[in-house]
Amino acid sequence: VIGHSVVRRCTIKDAGVCGIAGLFAAHMLIEDNLIEGTGWQKMELSWEAGAIKLHNSVDGLIRHNVFRNTFRADHIWLDCGNENNRITGNLFLDGKEQREAIFIECTRDGINLIDNNIIWNVEGRFDPKKIPVEPGSTGWYKMEEHDVVNGYGIYGEGTDHLRIVNNLIGNCRSAGYFAKPVSFRAEGMNRGGTSVDAELINNIFYHCEEAAIKMPTKANKAEGNCYVKEEGGYLRILYPQPPVCLHL
């Protein structure tokens, strides 16, 4: 689809790579759909795999959809230049070998709102054999986190101004929210991606195994959230190194 489209009350099953794909996807309305079993062709590294994958999404609304059993792909991936979008009232369930449920990439301008969703069970996609062994107390003294394990509810890559509000995010293999800057992803005279000014407000985080929230820097905010069945140090600020592992 190329913008100005409505996708409503469809059942999309067993798409090998992508359920709904869009370019220059302005003014999209995607609502009341069931999208399940996407990604069985194991093409996540092809860059275009997702139950919904849109480029340059502007003024879009994605609401009241059910995503189930997406395999090695994102439930939603908004790629580059996304502004004034709302993702609301969706169920994101059982991401199989899934790196993240929602991926917002390379978005420097404008606010995007993710609110009132349930994100549940994001398994992660990584090789367990590569997880460093930390016998005894050796893990206490490391100066940075290893980057092997993933499995995020929401992942922002080089993305600013996310608003994440009133969501239930649970059973994520790594973190409910994770973001990182992409400092050198600059085109022409544009700046790189900084991943600042995210606000996480009034969410419930349940049993995210490494941390509830991993912020790249202090230039982000978490306020009024509830943390259930989390381990110590479940609020993390990763840069500048060494990371700090905090709680309320």
Regions found by a protein language model. Give the residues of each.
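Glycine- and acidic/polar-rich repeat regions and solenoidal domains
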Residues: 1-8, 13-248
